[in-house]
Structure formats: structure tokens, C-alpha cells
């Protein structure tokens, strides 16, 4: 595994986990 790939994967996971509740909240409202 490359450090860059790991960093990108971590960034995607964090952004997804932080944006999902917002998207769900907006669609729910």
C-alpha cells in the first residue's frame, strides 16, 4: 500500500462519514 493511497482512502472515508448525515438531514427535511 502506498502512503498516498492510504491518505486518499482516509480522506474519502472521513469526508463521506461527515457529509452523509448532512445529506440525509437535508433530504429528510
UniProtKB/Swiss-Prot annotation:
The UniProt similarity line reads:
Belongs to the PetN family.
On assembly, the entry states: The 4 large subunits of the cytochrome b6-f complex are cytochrome b6, subunit IV (17 kDa polypeptide, PetD), cytochrome f and the Rieske protein, while the 4 small subunits are PetG, PetL, PetM and PetN. The complex functions as a dimer.
One Gene Ontology cellular component annotation? cytochrome b6f complex
Q: What does this protein do?
A: Component of the cytochrome b6-f complex, which mediates electron transfer between photosystem II (PSII) and photosystem I (PSI), cyclic electron flow around PSI, and state transitions.
GO MF terms here are: electron transporter, transferring electrons within cytochrome b6/f complex of photosystem II activity
HAMAP family, sorted: Cytb6_f_PetN
Protein name per UniProt: Cytochrome b6-f complex subunit 8
Annotated membrane-spanning segments are 3-23
Query: What is the membrane topology here?
Result: Single-pass membrane protein
Record-level GO BP terms: cytochrome complex assembly; photosynthesis
* Keywords, sorted A to Z: Chloroplast, Electron transport, Membrane, Photosynthesis, Plastid, Thylakoid, Transmembrane, Transmembrane helix, Transport
| Gene behind the chain | petN
Q: Where in the cell is it found?
A: Plastid, Chloroplast thylakoid membrane
Pfam families linked to this entry: PetN
Amino acid at each position: 500500500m502506498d502512503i498516498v493511497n492510504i491518505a486518499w482512502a482516509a480522506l474519502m472515508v472521513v469526508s463521506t462519514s461527515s457529509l452523509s448525515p448532512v445529506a440525509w438531514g437535508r433530504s429528510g427535511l
